[in-house]
Structures are given as structure tokens and as C-alpha cells.
Amino acid sequence: MRLTVIAVGKLKQGPERELAERYRARFDDIGRKLGFRGLDIHEISESRARDAATRMAEEAAAIAALVPDGGALVTLDERGKSVDSAAFAAQLGRWRDESVPGTIFVIGGADGLLPELRRKAKLCLSFGAATWPHQMVRVMLLEQIYRAATILAGHPYHRA
């Protein structure tokens, strides 16, 4: 199963990008041994439309163009479901074992995600009720993906 992160907005050079790349590389090392075929990251430019509804619609269209049929769509949203790391790992493992071709994680821009896109998701995931900058959400998501792989592998990184 291939994992994909689609994020509205680009990470500039700096500590967030370095940390994101570190977790991605760590996942690649352990993920392949677990039957994951890699982790792709696609950055979508933020819409420059004047109103939020138009911005979200334009960003949703760009996201939809990158979402393959048959994959498990996971949106990140403050109204989503909070799951612990073990449950997140178990869900990724189930999708892998069910031969789901890919899991696609979507991080919205400053205005969030279009409600229609959130409704299409198999899982709407939250990192709590707080609002986080999209740069931090990307790092947090990549860390959780790496952590999930270590849980599935029985690696000591996760000590719960």
C-alpha cells in the first residue's frame, strides 16, 4: 500500500521541512519492510481567490485531481476524530492487509477543507480541538505515520 500526503501550502526551507523530511525518511526505511510501498508528498499551491468558499473549492479541485480511485481518503480537520497512536497504527495495518491500494492524507489550507471533501473521507482525523498551522500538522502527521509503522513492526520507538 502506498501512502500519500496532499497538503495545501508549501513548506519553506527551515526546521519544519527538515523534521518532516526526517520522519518521511525514517518511515521509508521501516515501511518497506512492512509492505508499504513508499510515502509521497504533494504540495498544492494555496488559492489566491478573494473569498474563503472559492478558495476551498479551488483547493478541493486540485486535491481531487491527485486522489486515485479505490484509496482510503483521510482528511485532517479539527472537527475530526481523535485517535491514539495504537488505533491509528491498527487502522493503517487493516487497510494494508485488506489490500487497499493506497491511503491518501489531506491537509487543508488556512480555510480548511470543503465539506464535500470531508464527507468523502473514510476517516476524518483530528490532532485535538486546537487549530494548528499547516506546517506543524504536516510534521505531526508524518511523525504519527512513522510511529504507526514502528508499532506495526514492534519497534521500541513507541513506548506506551
From Swiss-Prot:
The lineage of its organism: Bacteria, Pseudomonadati, Pseudomonadota, Alphaproteobacteria, Hyphomicrobiales. It holds the Pfam family SPOUT_MTase. Specifically methylates the pseudouridine at position 1915 (m3Psi1915) in 23S rRNA. Keywords: Cytoplasm, Methyltransferase, rRNA processing, S-adenosyl-L-methionine, Transferase. GO terms for molecular function: rRNA (pseudouridine-N3-)-methyltransferase activity. GO terms for cellular component: cytoplasm. It comes from Rhodopseudomonas palustris (strain HaA2). PANTHER family: METHYLTRANSFERASE, RIBOSOMAL RNA LARGE SUBUNIT METHYLTRANSFERASE H. It catalyses: pseudouridine(1915) in 23S rRNA + S-adenosyl-L-methionine = N(3)-methylpseudouridine(1915) in 23S rRNA + S-adenosyl-L-homocysteine + H(+). This is Ribosomal RNA large subunit methyltransferase H.
